[in-house]
Amino acid sequence: MQGRLSRRTRCAGLALGTALLMAGCAGPRVQQSQSSGAGLESVDGATVSLAAFENSAFPYHGMIPNYQETGKTRPFLDVDENGRLGHSSPRGGIHWEDQTYSDRSVLLAAPQSFDPAKPGVIIVFFHGNNATLSRDVIARQQIVRQLADSGLNGGLVAPQLAVDAQDSSAGRFWSAGGFAAFLGEAQSKLGDLYPNARGAFRRMPVIIVAYSGGYLPAAYSLAVGGDQGRVRGLVLLDALYGERDKFVSWAEGPGRSAFFVSAYSASSRAGNDAVRAELEAAGVPTVNGLPGQLTPGVVAFVDAGSVDHNDFVTSAWGGAPLRDIFSRIGG
């Protein structure tokens, strides 16, 4: 899959995240922020920046609600080794805060065709496990290119979650109002990039997109994040692995005035089948495949077939599923 990347994309990813890429080739070390010293770049038909946020997903020193869906809470940082704090992940062992949960970077991007005078949207993208913004979200998964190629008028914001780790922790998105605080800062920083669009960004509806382990911050953003009235769309890419009740509750309630698309491979088929059955039992109509337009009330499930989960974002139908989905969204 790496062979598909354009030379321009690879170079831009290196420019934005050189320190991180070098860290991936070395042994364990303290995580450096991808936003350190990063300015504006032109990447794949979009203007891109990596900015440090106060309301980033991490660092996070709070509790994990509904730990492993048991209804119980526990401290997120539950390991202290001579003052070095860490989180014991049920799948990935111990992840140290200084390596995995200290990067405040957030990807900001808008197509070069972006026009603040026209209707637009803000896309919030939650990446999956074992990912960084520069190496994976920009370069490998081509999220920026897919947005630019779709023709959708809007801005993209993607917070760094657990850095290059097998962990889906939501961090501050677990907190009540965490999503609203993040969104408020995001629209302000997008306004810094496009001063003439400050007012437009404050009014734009929001589309949440989650791939794989990004389901966890997405679920809590919908359930307790605040500003749910601005969320006019939810896109899950092979992501229904847990917290199904939160997605169902949203689709039955606030989501009635939004659209909901869940595309899946065999990896998350069981979760999708379960959510779809619950929604239909509650009287929420669903459709197979993508309709021509994604309008309020659309609930679509897309079976992508035998696609490798790790390559889903660039291999599902046509090789650019987000480009296809974004192209069906009205501003």
How would you name each of these model-derived features?
Residues 25-121, 154, 287-288:
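A domain-start/cap signature at the N-terminus of enzymes
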Residues 228-239:
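A conserved short beta-strand
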Residues 182-202:
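Conserved acidic catalytic loop of the alpha/beta-hydrolase fold
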Residues 262-273, 280-331:
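C-terminal catalytic histidine-bearing segment of alpha/beta-hydrolase fold enzymes
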Residues 199-212:
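Alpha/beta-hydrolase fold nucleophile elbow
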Residues 13-23:
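Bacterial N-terminal signal peptides
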Residues 119-122, 126-189:
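Active-site machinery of serine-nucleophile hydrolases
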Residues 215-226:
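Short glycine-enriched nucleophile-adjacent loop
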